[in-house]
Regions:
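Short, small-residue-enriched loops and turns at beta-alpha junctions
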Residues: 12-15, 74-75, 196-199
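Short Gly/Thr/Asp-enriched flexible loops that form oxyanion-binding sites at enzyme active sites
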Residues: 43-62, 199-205
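Short beta-strand segments
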Residues: 40-42, 66-69, 100-105, 168, ...
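ATP/NTP phosphate-donor binding region
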Residues: 1-29
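Structural motif
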Residues: 36-37, 188
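Charged helix-capping and loop-helix junction motifs
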Residues: 20, 81-84, 202-205
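Internal gly/pro-rich beta-alpha loop/helix module
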Residues: 67-136
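Accessory alpha-helical/coil subdomains and C-terminal extensions
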Residues: 1, 109-196, 201-202
Length: 205
């Protein structure tokens, strides 16, 4: 196969914000009909956020769009970058459309990937659904029934409202925080509640 390399951003992933999501999404969408697959290398700190946002900004892609990175730089003797790239290329050659994250022998839907470990090579987990693919000595094994497929046209939507706050509840969360957020004129509050959505209603209610 032929490879084409394009530099989009040179930025520590801790600084990837909604403005950069827009740059990345536009770059992908412009070339989406020119290639059989697109692989994006990305720092691991915010890669799951970017993969998820691109999943919503570019809907119904007909080609694989895969994010990957590494815990150690590619020049390090113990780097995980090479195998992660191999996993990404294996997914790229599958021809299955969608946005994915390839890391430590797992292929995860972009909307399901979360970084849960800071230094381990097994840094990402697939939340509330199994990984859609595994790379091992047998090659790439996909569970295609877990990958959403649509006959709809590929669409691009870059209307991002970044004035939304995520509030993670703890048993000691002070409800006055909500008033502060309203005064700050946030346009949306997402409450990460307990379990399946429980919120305290005694004292701190």
């Amino acid at each position: 196969f032929e490879l084409y390399v394009k530099e989009i951003l040179l930025l520590d992933s801790s600084n990837i914000q909604p403005e950069e999501w827009n740059v990345i999404a536009k770059a992908i969408y412009i070339d989406i009909n020119n290639y059989d697959a697109i692989i994006i290398t990305h720092g691991t700190d915010t890669m799951a956020y970017t993969a998820s946002m691109i999943s919503f900004m570019i809907q119904n892609p007909k080609i694989p769009i895969i994010f990957t990175g590494s815990q150690l730089p590619i020049g390090n003797f113990l780097t995980d970058a090479i195998f992660n790239l191999r996993s990404a290329f294996a997914m790229a050659m599958s021809g299955v459309g969608g946005v994915f994250l390839a890391f430590d022998r797992q292929i995860i839907l972009g909307t399901r990937a979360v970084k849960v470990r800071t230094t381990s090579f097994h840094a990402f987990e697939s939340i509330n659904t199994p990984p859609v693919g595994i790379v091992d000595s047998h090659g790439l094994t996909l569970q295609k029934n877990l990958i959403p497929q649509h006959d709809l046209d590929t669409t691009f939507n870059n209307k991002i409202n970044s004035n939304v706050f995520l509030l993670k509840l703890t048993p000691a969360t002070n409800p006055a925080i909500i008033d502060l957020l309203i005064k700050a004129k946030v346009q949306g509050i997402v409450i990460e509640a307990f379990g399946a959505g429980g919120i305290q209603f005694v004292r701190r209610d």
